[in-house]
Amino acid sequence: MNADTAARIAELLHQVGEIHHMVFSDTDGNDDDWATFYSDWLLTHSDLPRLLARRPIRSHLTRDLVELDEQYTSSGPSQPWPAWYAERLVEKYR
């Protein structure tokens, strides 16, 4: 795994999280369909496809984000979620 690539993807995940929270500020960032927002933004407004050297199918990325959220929540790692997700996305898509 390329640690630099994972770090850059973690930055993108943090960025989309901040954007999502601003867009959904009226609900304090709560959005049951957050993963669709994230995947759409990551694929259309970020360098994610270039960093992965491929463009994931949006619905697959959405599913992966939901699964990562479930795994992260249940395992409770000490690593911040953006870095944890990024490592796994790089493993899957590169």
Q: Language-model features: where?
A:
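Eukaryotic low-complexity, intrinsically disordered regulatory segments enriched in serine, proline
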Residues: 1-94
